[in-house]
Amino acid sequence: RLPVETLSAFNQLFRKELGSNNVSTFEEGEFTRPSARFATESGRSFEGKLDDLKTADSILVLGTDLVRHHEVVGFFAKRLLPSGTKLLVIDQKENDLAPLSNKTLRATKSSDEDVLSALSAAIVKLGLAKGKTAVKAGDLDGLASKTGLESEEYLDAAYVIAASEKPVILFEKGITPSAVADFATLIGARIISIKGGANNLAASQLKLDQPLNLKTSKAVVVFAGDDEVSQKMTNEVEKVPFKVVQAAYASPLTAAADVVLPSTTWLEQDGHYLNLDGHLQEAHRAITPAEECMSASEALAAIATGFGIALEDNWEKELHQQVASVELN
């Protein structure tokens, strides 16, 4: 929930000025790193916008539960169904959208990439392909068998997603973006990836998306704000000899800290947020914080001053330092 300004200042201070190569976010790029890498390698933004979802006549939800974890996007998808938009759900787990779908593929014996390959063969067999693929119609039985599902299941699913003019694919972590992009080309679909928490896309653009390794760290600085810190992350931080934590609420993490800095909540701070659509939005504080509580940006500026460091306000330029998975605006 930290604004872009804070993420930029955090990156400047600890990576660029103090030389740490172990700077990231709580999610460690889990939702964004593969897509960011694919965009960099291909040299282009490959995702569409939420506006594409509004006009979709078929939707593929791939490996994500929009009801449980991404309610806003889930609402956009669900409200289209009464008007005739078709829904295909592919997930190895139980998915709360499945009861609303026209077809659900739950292949627990294989990867989502394998399922897309079998589905591609079914699309080719039905003559619904709009783009090229190396998969052939004759591959269907073998590919379907590999996933533990019958060929007929894939033929049904192929008709749901490919017999339409404006298909949209919604996907999350756990599948290779290049595989999704290839499948999208086959059926002429737009792609939207679900990017996790607020400002995850901004963190990715600032390269704050790498896995953390705290095993040899002697000190750690955590700016939690009012975010909830996982038990796994708390356990990792607790092992570090010296811990500084800025947080809005008491938690096991603050209890283990050597230094605790009181923090404002997201309602008590100004700043910018980059949504999954690539749209930059400005938030204004709704509540005046207590005098003793600094925002994360103010705390970082104070720490930087103590080191004799002047932080630059160039976060907008930094957001465009690499190709994003979705066009920024």
Where are these regions (language model features)?
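Cofactor-pocket helix-loop regions in the catalytic cores of large enzyme subunits
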Residues: R1-N329
